[in-house]
Amino acid sequence: MELLEMNCPYCCSPETRVHCTYQTQNYGPRRLYECTACFEYFSETKHTLLEDLKTPLSVVWNVLNARTEGMGLNATVRTFGVAKNTVLDWEQRCADLQPVLFLYSLVHQFLQVVIEGDEAYTKIAKNVPPDQSTGWTLLLIDRASRFIWTLECGKKDRKLFEQAIQTLEQIIQDSEDLTLLTDGERRYGNLLFEICHQLIRTGKPGRPSKTLKKGVKVRIKNKGSQAHHKGPKRSKYQAPWKEHPHTEQAVDVKEIHANHAEAFFSALRRKCATFRRRTNTYAKSTKGLQRLLDVYWVIHNFIRIHFTTQEVPAVSLGVIDRRLSVPELFQIHRA
């Protein structure tokens, strides 16, 4: 597996050889490598989560697993008898793997991708109106494999949606057919239309029409009553943005929903302490929430088996061949 290859951390060369072994207190013997390209020496834990880590790996994993199963930060500190800053350091080490694994996932090619988009809200720092809160979390999840592409938090504005659409743009470049399904939120499609469009030149006079790129489809399900809306009512299922004439339009009405994304957020409110309702908000921050979301992203996609597919989401999507073990995850080089 390419993720686990031993490359030089200085020049990224794969031409390395074992120089010697040395003994550690908690992890047994380890290897010291020599790069035959730049002649630098480095340990097998260089630039990994295990670098300068003296605590046994089982303790670190139990703490991270508890944090992604609903235990709060202070409760974790009391239960496992470790310092708060130590727990935060372990979380940050694991969160640093998110950009590495995300880029590794993007280099793969996909024939057909169906992505659901949804948002969830939690209070940050203090209780403010939802439109002013920075606790909105935006999710893009693959329907078939349950692989999470985007899990970003912040204020519900154009900047947050642009981050998700930039991810979609990269997926579009690596897939032949992409369908985006949302529950009434039109900003996904608006920004996607701005970024991923093309001009249809027919040779007729006038300005060429602008459409989504070939193979890209966006569908919206308008939920709830529209009795209080003035003017014409929107249909329940819509394709509000013009699509390429050669794009296959076969999307069943029954398939236009974001139920899997909503179910994910229902589970997240149990598995992530910052999303649990009726909790104190004095200890929450956007930075801390994003750090924990990145940890959850790594464990959900590459470690934890999903109960529906009975596979790790990354395996179901075809990103990796098998589930990563915890020691293997901790040996991946950080960004």
Regions found by a protein language model. Give the residues of each.
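Residue-level recognition of single "structural anchor" positions
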Residues: M1-A335
